[in-house]
Amino acid sequence: MEAKAKLSMIRISPRKMRLVADTIRNKAVSVAVATLKNLNKDAAEPILKLLNSAVANAVNNNGMEADKLYVKTIFVNEGPTLKRFRPRAHGRAYEIFKRTSHVVIVVSDEK
């Protein structure tokens, strides 16, 4: 069986989120949690919370055992971009993109 969790509108760019997501793909949940706790990236914290949510969904809604779960799928999509302007010299302005991410994680107990 599978259990899913989604996280939307995270104010971290998708490129940075994918670096963290790639480190835990196809790993056991216990290994993934240990990896995320020791990873020195800002994106690790929201992904860790999302992984814990997916495990809780698997245990509470589907009756799966937490120690048999692994990260079957994790992907990061680009969310809406906030556009801001930075004043520059001679009346110019540079556009600043504040990117957001959507993350979906699926845990499963069967390989």
UniProtKB/Swiss-Prot annotation:
Cited PANTHER family: CHLOROPLAST 50S RIBOSOMAL PROTEIN L22-RELATED, LARGE RIBOSOMAL SUBUNIT PROTEIN UL22M
SUPFAM superfamilies the UniProt entry points to: Ribosomal protein L22
A single GO molecular function term of this UniProt record: structural constituent of ribosome
Keywords annotated in UniProt: Ribonucleoprotein, Ribosomal protein, RNA-binding, rRNA-binding
Gene name as annotated: rplV
Quaternary structure note: Part of the 50S ribosomal subunit.
Species assigned in the record: Mycoplasma capricolum subsp. capricolum (strain California kid / ATCC 27343 / NCTC 10154)
UniProt keyword Ribosomal protein, yes or no: yes
InterPro entries membership: Ribosomal_uL22, Ribosomal_uL22_bac/chlpt-type, Ribosomal_uL22_bac/org-type, Ribosomal_uL22_CS, Ribosomal_uL22_sf
HAMAP family xref list: Ribosomal_uL22_B (MF_01331_B)
Any one biological process term the GO annotation gives: translation
Protein name, UniProt field: Large ribosomal subunit protein uL22
One GO location term (cellular component): cytosolic large ribosomal subunit
Similarity comment: Belongs to the universal ribosomal protein uL22 family.
Function: This protein binds specifically to 23S rRNA; its binding is stimulated by other ribosomal proteins, e.g. L4, L17, and L20. It is important during the early stages of 50S assembly. It makes multiple contacts with different domains of the 23S rRNA in the assembled 50S subunit and ribosome.
Domain of life: Bacteria
A Pfam family it matches: Ribosomal_L22
Keyword Ribosomal protein: yes
